[in-house]
């Protein structure tokens, strides 16, 4: 059950990342890397305010990053992110 909830949240996260508004053409055609562009944090929370069994420490806060060059230590790949026409790796811990 917990796995199903986690996978559902990741699918919703992927849809949300793809639903970002389209940026101006000038911004999309830039090829130089901007400071902080590689790491974009996303936080996902499970459960309701009253608390449920799903609010364990391991599921309470899932932090994901869209990275250009692969996942860092203690992170695992959960798919891909797309921002404009660029593809990134979705890394979560």
From Swiss-Prot:
The UniProt record lists the keyword Acetylation: no
Places the protein is found: Secreted
Keywords: Antibiotic, Antimicrobial, Defensin, Disulfide bond, Secreted, Signal
Keyword field contains Metal-binding: no
Gene Ontology CC, one term: extracellular space
GO biological process assignments: defense response to bacterium
InterPro entries according to UniProt: Alpha-defensin, Alpha-defensin_C, Alpha-defensin_N, Beta/alpha-defensin_C
Broad class of the protein's primary localization: secreted
Stretch list, region Disordered: 22-54
Signal peptide: 1-19
Propiece residue ranges: 20-58
Disulfide links within the chain: 64-92, 66-81, 71-91
SMART domains: Defensin_propep, DEFSN
PROSITE patterns to which the protein is assigned, alphabetical: DEFENSIN
Family membership: Belongs to the alpha-defensin family.
Function, in words: Probably contributes to the antimicrobial barrier function of the small bowel mucosa.
Protein name: Alpha-defensin 13
Gene assigned in the entry: Defa13
């Amino acid at each position: 059950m917990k796995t199903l909830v986690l996978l559902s949240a990741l699918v919703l996260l992927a849809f949300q990342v793809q639903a970002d508004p389209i940026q101006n053409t000038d911004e999309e055609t830039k090829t130089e890397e901007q400071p902080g562009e590689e790491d974009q944090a996303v936080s996902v929370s499970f459960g309701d305010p009253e608390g449920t069994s799903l609010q364990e420490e391991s599921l309470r806060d899932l932090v994901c990053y869209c990275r250009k060059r692969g996942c860092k230590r203690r992170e695992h790949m959960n798919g891909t992110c797309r921002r404009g026409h660029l593809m990134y790796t979705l890394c979560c811990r």
